């Protein structure tokens, strides 16, 4: 059976054509599935009955299964979605008065093995399908519209948009969950197409952000195929330190990464790149490194986002203190670089990316008598 959640509009037009249907049927299907949240073809009332019966014979709308739902005291909400074989991925909703941001995963685990990342410690299992990526947004809109566990509902009067579609609970999407989005390139781009489509979620390019650790060739392809807002996980101002924290830097060093960022800017929906910098106590948080960072990025239109480290068991790192973060920020701001410190959210629900999914995987392995290596099969 074909899962229609795997198709963007172009692919749905082709699919409908193969069934002898007009292109407008694709638009109808997109709206029923992504805007109305329907998964039963018989409820799609403006489709001809004959077409609905044909769809039932060859297609489904199959979503990933929600296996747990956690809400923090600050309103942050994290869901776990089963991906089979005892594995799970996470999506996180961060409510604010003027926006609702959904953090979306792109892979089960991650092969890049960043030393401070809980997901990276789990290793790589597989890429998520388009349905598993876009299904996170589908689920978030449905669950949040239901109103349960949402102490901070979106104030739509403060949302800067002309599109009624973005008055749904999720107004912004950041591809900053589990996995390296650009390592799952084709599925990522198809999911982005759906996020941006007026027949699906109607988000603007400025409200969709892809975060990357620095896959330079794929970054160039994203610029050509679907340029959305860009965030780069930098975390160090020199190759020696970044090689330790972000091993992909050995293949695509900082000089090549910054050159790719400069190539990306003319196509980007924003006139700057966001550089993310996790603050690790005694590792990358000194004033000297802040000054080095100023020299590195001063000619690139950018914003720096300093991220207090979310500790997890066995990480070997600690979060920088408030004074160290403040001193680091001050050096950047005094140099004229727009700098923010990310507000820590969801500390009471295992906020570190991949932490809850890792707990599920570890529990499954223990139950099945498995050690490291191939993932256990859930029973």
From Swiss-Prot:
Catalytic function, reaction form: adenosine(2503) in 23S rRNA + 2 reduced [2Fe-2S]-[ferredoxin] + 2 S-adenosyl-L-methionine = 2-methyladenosine(2503) in 23S rRNA + 5'-deoxyadenosine + L-methionine + 2 oxidized [2Fe-2S]-[ferredoxin] + S-adenosyl-L-homocysteine; adenosine(37) in tRNA + 2 reduced [2Fe-2S]-[ferredoxin] + 2 S-adenosyl-L-methionine = 2-methyladenosine(37) in tRNA + 5'-deoxyadenosine + L-methionine + 2 oxidized [2Fe-2S]-[ferredoxin] + S-adenosyl-L-homocysteine
Primary subcellular site in the record, as a coarse category: cytoplasm
Subcellular location: Cytoplasm
GO biological process: rRNA base methylation; tRNA methylation
Keyword line: 4Fe-4S, Cytoplasm, Disulfide bond, Iron, Iron-sulfur, Metal-binding, Methyltransferase, rRNA processing, S-adenosyl-L-methionine, Transferase, tRNA processing
Disulfide bonds: 103-353
Cofactor note: Binds 1 [4Fe-4S] cluster. The cluster is coordinated with 3 cysteines and an exchangeable S-adenosyl-L-methionine.
Positions of [4Fe-4S] cluster binding: 110, 114, 117
EC number: 2.1.1.192
Any Pfam family the entry gives: Radical_SAM
GO CC annotations, alphabetized: cytoplasm
Residues of the Radical SAM core domain: 96-348
Known cofactor(s): [4Fe-4S] cluster
Positions annotated to bind S-adenosyl-L-methionine: 179-180, 211, 233-235, 310
Function in brief: Specifically methylates position 2 of adenine 2503 in 23S rRNA and position 2 of adenine 37 in tRNAs. m2A2503 modification seems to play a crucial role in the proofreading step occurring at the peptidyl transferase center and thus would serve to optimize ribosomal fidelity.
Family statement: Belongs to the radical SAM superfamily. RlmN family.
Protein's name according to its UniProt entry: Dual-specificity RNA methyltransferase RlmN
Organism: Nitrosomonas europaea (strain ATCC 19718 / CIP 103999 / KCTC 2705 / NBRC 14298)
